[in-house]
Each structure stands twice: as structure tokens, then as C-alpha cells.
């Protein structure tokens, strides 16, 4: 029963292990050489073969700001009156209250964006009016002198 089975001798087994080891060394050497070659090509001028993305279209917003349509917006989560909100925006990343003069995004879209990120609350935004004029919002008239006392959320943009 055991006589027909062939067991490799110790010398044959070492020979197989040695061949396996040499083969592993050969593969590792090949991989190291190809990595060094690729690195050398990238460092010394062969970088034209790699397609690089243009950085012109990339913009970064400060932490806790939302990037949208090439502009950054900060949606407050605390209430301030208009004057304090405007000052906060000026002191925060050199920004302003979001306003109706923005060329990148109209105010309606901005307020719809605020619903997406936060809630249906009201926000201070800067809307240019001639002096001593009032604006009608939701069937209510607010004059500029009242804004110092009304506290609500606000949106900064830069």
C-alpha cells in the first residue's frame, strides 16, 4: 500500500523550493524595475503623456460653506438682526450678505438652495432699494429702519 506511493526526497524538495524562490525573486525584481522606470518617466519630462485636469474649474469653499455654481455660500444656523448679520459676513472670509446683484445665481435659486440644505426658514439677504423706500414681502411692508431689531437666519456669499 505505501510502497507504490512516491515521496520526494529531501534533495528534490529543496530543488523545487529553490526554483520557486528564484521565480519569486525574478517577479519582484521585474516589478521594482518597472516602478522605477515609470517614476523616472514621470519625474524627468515624460509627464506630457499623462492627461492633467485643468485647475481653472476647481474652486474651494471654507469649512461649513456650500459651493454652488462657482460661488460659496454660508447658511447661518443662528439668528441675528440685519446689521449684525451683515457685519458677521464682512468679518467672515471677506464675504457679504447674499444679494440681488449677484451675477452667478439669482436670489430665488439661492433661497431654494437654502431649503435643500436647511429648512423653509426666512433669511437675511441684501436687496438694494432706493433710500426711504419700502419693499413688500408676503403681503407685509417692512421699512429699512426695522431691520435692526428683527432677528432671523442669514446667508453670506463670496
Swiss-Prot record:
Glycans are attached at residues 81, 94, 100, 106, 112, 119, 139. Induction: Expressed in the early phase of the viral replicative cycle. Expressed in the late phase of the viral replicative cycle. Keywords: Disulfide bond, Early protein, Glycoprotein, Host endoplasmic reticulum, Host membrane, Host-virus interaction, Lectin, Membrane, Modulation of host cell apoptosis by virus, Signal-anchor, Transmembrane, Transmembrane helix. Pfam families: UL45. Residues 61-157 are annotated as: Lectin-like. Disulfide bonds join 61-72. It comes from the Viruses. Residues 1-26 are cytoplasmic. It is a single-pass type II membrane protein. GO terms for cellular component: host cell endoplasmic reticulum membrane; membrane. Its main location: host cell. It is found in: Host endoplasmic reticulum membrane. One of its GO terms (biological process) is symbiont-mediated perturbation of host apoptosis. Down-regulates MHC-I expression by impairing the appropriate configuration or presentation into the plasma membrane of the latter. Participates in viral hemadsorption, which may help viral spread. Reduces the transactivating activity of host TP53, thus inhibiting apoptosis. Non-essential for virus growth in swine macrophage cell cultures. Belongs to the asfivirus lectin-like protein family. This is Lectin-like protein EP153R. It comes from African swine fever virus (isolate Pig/Kenya/KEN-50/1950) (ASFV).
